[in-house]
């Protein structure tokens, strides 16, 4: 639903105008933006990823399999595409958007592999760790990043990599403050629900991974 609203507002540009009507469909004026290579609402502008994000890559710490074996716990350990393990302490706490840096960096549509994470986490050095600047939200940042074509910002063909400089320099739509705030207020309850469900799924996966070995070696049984 958040993606649908985003597309309606910032791809089709039918966000509510001052009369509550869809802007472009109601005759809202558009102008061509050379930097974005598309039409955008008149008097809107562009910005770069660097201007809307705080990059925390310097705080990442990779752990080897052996190191993680000695640190087993309940804190998710994130890699480029998802949770790789669970450890006994976090190095990050808060709300973040992760963008895969190397290895698997692109989904089937040619867009970045992203993860929206929250709470206490450990993150390795194969994914960029981003937070939005004031006035943006993690969900809006996630949606803006998801529209980036990886082919423009990647280096390498066999071993692809998205370096910090290429990511920072990529130009995106600059959304006016009032409309951005309205959008965030609209999708924030959806984001909260998504994160709650994601946490529940992670808890179930962790419980499954603990229970299955117990069942297989006879340490646990299921009664009828």
Predicted regions, residues:
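Proline-centric
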Residues: 39-42, 127-135, 150-152, 165-193
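A short beta-sheet element
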Residues: 79-83, 89-168
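Structural beta-strand/beta-sheet cores of well-ordered domains, especially the beta-sheet scaffolds
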Residues: 11, 42-45, 59, 73-76, ...
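A general structural signal for short secondary-structure junctions and capping/turn motifs
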Residues: 53, 65-70, 87-91, 119-121
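Non-catalytic DNA-recognition/assembly elements of restriction-modification systems
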Residues: 1-5, 27-62, 67-79, 177-223
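Internal hydrophobic scaffold segments of catalytic domains
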Residues: 1-10, 85-90
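Short coil/turn segments at secondary-structure boundaries
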Residues: 20-25, 63-70, 155-159
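Alpha-helical scaffold segments that mediate packing/assembly in large oligomeric complexes
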Residues: 4-30
């Amino acid at each position: 639903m958040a993606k649908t609203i985003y597309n309606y507002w910032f791809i089709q540009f039918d966000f509510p105008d001052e009369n509550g009507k869809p802007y472009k469909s109601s005759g809202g004026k558009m102008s061509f933006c050379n930097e974005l290579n598309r039409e955008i609402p008149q008097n809107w502008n562009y910005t770069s990823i660097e201007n809307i994000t705080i990059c925390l890559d310097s705080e990442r710490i990779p752990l080897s399999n052996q190191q993680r074996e000695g640190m087993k716990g309940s804190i998710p350990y994130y890699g480029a595409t998802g949770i790789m393990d669970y450890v006994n302490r976090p190095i990050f706490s808060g709300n973040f958007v992760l963008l895969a840096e190397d290895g698997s960096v692109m989904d089937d549509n040619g867009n970045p592999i992203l993860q929206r994470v929250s709470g206490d986490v450990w993150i390795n050095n194969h994914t960029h760790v981003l937070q939005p600047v004031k006035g943006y939200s993690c969900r809006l940042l996630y949606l803006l990043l998801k529209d980036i074509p990886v082919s423009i910002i990647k280096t390498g063909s066999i071993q692809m990599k998205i370096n910090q400089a290429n990511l920072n320099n990529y130009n995106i739509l600059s959304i006016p403050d009032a409309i951005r705030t309205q959008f965030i207020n609209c999708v924030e309850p959806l984001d909260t629900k998504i994160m709650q469900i994601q946490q529940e799924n992670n808890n179930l996966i962790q419980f499954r991974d603990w229970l299955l070995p117990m069942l297989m070696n006879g340490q646990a049984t299921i009664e009828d």
